[in-house]
Each structure stands twice: as C-alpha cells, then as structure tokens.
C-alpha cells in the first residue's frame, strides 16, 4: 500500500516537474552554467531541449483532455488537415537529399507544436504554478544584465572589456531569447503584480525594480543593435495600443523604459568606446537576408511540392554561410513545400481564435505572441533551441487562457446523446492524430539523434560554424572532441551529412 501510494504521488508530481523544464533550460543558458556533457553550450541546450520535448510528447500521448478551446469548424479543419500535413512532411523527408536531417527537423517542429498542446493542458491544471514560473522566466535574463553592467563598469574605468554575452555564441540567440522574457516581465505575473494586501512601500519597491529590469533588458537590445527584436517589440506594443485600448495604462512600463534605455544608451555612447556595441541600430542593409530569401524562393521554385527537405537549406546550392534563411515562412515552404504552406495556412484560424478572444487574454502574453511572430520573419527565434522553447512556452501559456468547452461524457443513450457524441468526433480525431504523430516524432528523434544525446565530451563540427540544429549547422551528428574528425572539418562534414 505504501509503495502504491508513493507511486501515485510520484505520478501526480510528474506534470509539475515537466513545467520546470523550460525555466531550468533558461536558467542554464542565462547563468552560463555548464550543466551538460558536450563541449558547446548551444549543443547542450539542443540536447536538453530534445529530452524535454520527448517528455512533453510522452505526456501528450497519455494526456486525457475533457475540454477543448477550439470551435467545431476549427476542430473539423484540424482533423482533416493534420493527416495531410503529416503525410506531406514524411514524403518531403524521404525524398530529401539528406533524409535524416529532414526527418529530425520535421520531428523537432512537430514536437514543438505538440508541446504547446501539452503545456497548455498542464497550465490549465496548475494555473498558480504556471504564473509563478512565468515570473521567474521573466527574471532569468538578469544574469546577462549583471554581465553587461559589469562590462560597462570596466569600460568606464578604462579596463579591458570582457565578453558579456557568455554562452551565447551569436548575439541573435540572446536577443531572440530575451524577447518573450521581456513581455512576460511587462505582464507582471504572480508576485510581480501589484497586490492591495501587500505593504504599499513593498509594492512601490517591486514596481521600481521592474522598471529598472525592463530598462536593462532594453539596454541589452540597444547594445546588440537588435533591429528585428526592437521592431517586433514595437509591433507587439502597437497591437496592444490598437486592439486593447482598455490596457493603455499598462503601456507606460514598456514605453518609458524603451525611451529611458534609449537615452541612457546614447549617453553612454559618448563616454564609452563605440566598439562595445555589437552592431549599430541605424545601420543600412539587410545583413545578408535578401540573399537568403532569394535562395529560399529559388529552392521552392525548383522543388514546389515537397521542398528540399527540412534542414536541407544549409546544404543546398547556391552555398551561403547561414544555416537558416532568417524567415520562418520562407524556410518552411522552401524546405517542406506544400507541407510548409499548409502549416502556415493552419496558423490563420488559430490566430483568428486568439484575436476573437483578445479581450480576455493577458495583454502582454498576447503581445508576446505577436512580437515573436514578427521576429520570426527576420530572425531565428524559432530556430535556436532556447528561444524556441521560450517562445513555445509563451504560446502555450496564452493558449491556456482561451475559454474551453467541455466534452460530453454522459452515459445517457438517447438520441440527444448520440448527436452530442457525434459533435465530439472532430476533436477526438485530431487529438488521436496528434498522439500518433507524437509517438512517430519521438521515435524519429531517437533514431536520428539518440547517439548524440548520450555522446559525452562531443561537439558538432564543420568549416563554417553557422548554427541551425547544432552549433555547427552543417553537421548531422556530434563527434568526440579531439578526434580526427575535429581536426579535419571538411571530412567531418561529409561524414555527418
């Protein structure tokens, strides 16, 4: 009996532990902790992400849902479209030049989508825990703030400037991960919110601290010259200003800190050497995006139906350095063909569902979804492991606030019951399809990258170091550090493709 009780208690705690996965990944990344068994931080984050996504996929397989946020027409659309989408992605992967890369890429994005569904269910069942996790996620970039402020202090003192990005080998990895955290901070969930039962002085202290943290996050974006993230932030705030006029007063926090951080940045530019700034904000040019976008359109023109295969953009001609095109819609249609186009079309009714219920959704959680969507048009926010998980976490939290409709579970056997049970069929169809997809995606990920997950002291390698799935995006597998493959990157590339 004791053992049975202990097992039941452990099973009840498992969903709570799953909720801690994303904040733990963010803590490891922002704190520059080396809690992984591979050489590069990015590869370690990816392995952690794979494990977490497979666990969430497993939860989804055994998840029992008694309500739905989707209308009957939307459920029918999903029930029809999901098998077609899955079939097209399988066909795209099989015909790709590097089919293992394509299969792993398809599995990754399918598991990301399923994790939204799974985490939204967990958030509905544990709303208080979810709110507290949101508050902690919002504060985790403070580790980077401390690193930046330390670097500024050294620069003001005339000392050597240390690299303050720490584990983030690419500034876009940091800036894209910071975007969801910024909107979560502005939402002020859980204990970050004003509380009438709290001491007024404590309320003012917390509010003042949030203003300081928000300005610090904005300062990071200014110093990185993060044009895409800043534009996405403004679009998200603009959406709130236009479609949530009841929340205008809440815009004071982001707008004042946006302005204050900008003025501070300009002042520091006159005091500190300009080379402390990664990129100027008002720079001209597309940073090579136009060449990347032209390549995606060429690839889609050559492979309009099935695409070149997931994660095959980087290995396809013409050769370009970048591992992804910095535009998710173009990435999907060039790599997946009709499957990518169908996935984008499915986002339209889902977005309309959010828009229809915008008045009851947390205003900055809604703004975060808009901002991430815009950022995905210019950056790799949905390509890099940390920003992927933080963005997906924000989406799932937003989904959990949508109104739900209970499914009928009555045991009555009259005609009315038969009609009601029929109305549940579309929901049950796409739910069962998602569970099948989750199993296939987990098995695919284990088949392709199972050896990489357990590879100790390993790293990815190629001659270019353009991140995509791994830090070195042209590699398929990790190889032991110090091996012959590391010393001859071109050979390693041929082997790992």
Where are these regions (language model features)?
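Transmembrane signal-anchor hairpin modules in multi-pass inner-membrane enzymes, especially those
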Residues: 1-90, 125, 131, 191, ...
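Loop-to-helix entry and N-terminal half of a specific, functionally important transmembrane alpha helix
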Residues: 22-25, 356-383, 387-391, 398-399
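Interfacial transmembrane-helix termini
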Residues: 26-54, 73, 87-111, 147-173, ...
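Aromatic-anchored transmembrane helix interface
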Residues: 49-52, 77-89, 99-121, 134-135, ...
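Alpha-helical transmembrane segments of multi-pass inner-membrane proteins
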Residues: 53-60, 111-115, 130-158, 169-243, ...
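Hydrophobic alpha-helical membrane-interfacial segments at the cytosolic entry of transmembrane helices
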Residues: 84, 132-143, 213-214, 248-269, ...
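Flexible juxtamembrane loops connecting transmembrane helices in multi-pass membrane enzymes
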Residues: 256, 260-293, 315, 454-467
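TM-adjacent membrane-interface loops and short helices in multi-pass inner/ER membrane proteins
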Residues: 288-322, 329, 336-343
């Amino acid at each position: 009996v004791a053992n049975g009780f202990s097992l039941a208690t452990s099973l009840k705690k498992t969903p709570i532990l799953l909720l801690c996965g994303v904040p733990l990944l963010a803590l490891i990344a922002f704190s520059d902790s080396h809690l992984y068994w591979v050489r590069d931080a990015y590869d370690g984050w990816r392995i952690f992400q794979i494990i977490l996504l497979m666990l969430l996929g497993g939860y989804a397989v055994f998840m029992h849902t008694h309500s739905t946020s989707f209308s009957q027409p939307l459920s029918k659309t999903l029930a029809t479209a999901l098998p077609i989408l899955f079939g097209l992605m399988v066909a795209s992967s099989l015909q790709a030049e590097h089919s293992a890369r394509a299969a792993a890429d398809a599995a990754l994005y399918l598991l990301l989508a399923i994790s939204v569904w799974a985490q939204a269910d967990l958030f509905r069942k544990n709303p208080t825990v979810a709110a507290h996790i949101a508050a902690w996620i919002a504060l985790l970039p403070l580790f980077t703030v401390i690193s930046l402020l330390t670097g500024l202090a050294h620069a003001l003192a005339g000392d050597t400037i240390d690299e303050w990005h720490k584990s983030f080998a690419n500034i876009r990895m940091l800036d894209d991960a910071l975007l969801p955290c910024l909107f979560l901070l502005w939402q002020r969930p859980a204990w970050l919110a004003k509380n009438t039962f709290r001491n007024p002085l404590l309320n003012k202290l917390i509010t003042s601290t949030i203003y300081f943290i928000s300005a610090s996050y904005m300062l990071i974006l200014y110093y990185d010259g993060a044009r895409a993230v800043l534009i996405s932030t403004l679009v998200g705030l603009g959406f709130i200003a236009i479609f949530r006029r009841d929340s205008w007063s809440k815009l004071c926090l982001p707008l004042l800190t946006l302005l204050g951080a900008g003025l501070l940045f300009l002042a520091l530019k006159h005091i500190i050497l300009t080379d402390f700034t990664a990129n100027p904000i008002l720079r001209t040019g597309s940073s090579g995006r136009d060449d990347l976008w032209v390549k995606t359109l060429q690839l889609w023109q050559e492979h309009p139906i099935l695409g070149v295969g997931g994660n095959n953009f980087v290995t396809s001609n013409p050769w370009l350095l970048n591992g992804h095109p910095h535009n998710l819609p173009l990435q999907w249609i060039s790599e997946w063909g009709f499957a990518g186009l169908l996935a984008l079309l499915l986002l339209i009714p889902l977005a309309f569902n959010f828009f229809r219920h915008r008045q009851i959704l947390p205003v900055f959680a809604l703004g975060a979804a808009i901002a991430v969507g815009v950022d995905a048009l210019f950056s790799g926010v949905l390509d890099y492991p940390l920003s992927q998980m933080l963005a997906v976490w924000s989406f799932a939290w937003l989904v959990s606030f949508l109104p739900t409709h209970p499914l009928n579970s009555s045991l009555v056997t009259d005609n009315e019951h038969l009609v009601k049970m029929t109305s549940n069929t579309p929901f049950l169809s796409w739910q069962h399809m998602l569970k099948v997809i989750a199993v296939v995606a987990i098995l695919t990920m284990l088949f392709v990258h199972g050896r990489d997950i357990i590879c100790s002291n390993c790293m990815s390698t190629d001659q270019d170091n353009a991140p995509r799935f791994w830090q070195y995006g042209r590699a398929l597998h990790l190889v032991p550090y110090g091996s012959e493959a590391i010393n001859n990157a071109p050979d390693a590339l041929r082997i790992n493709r």
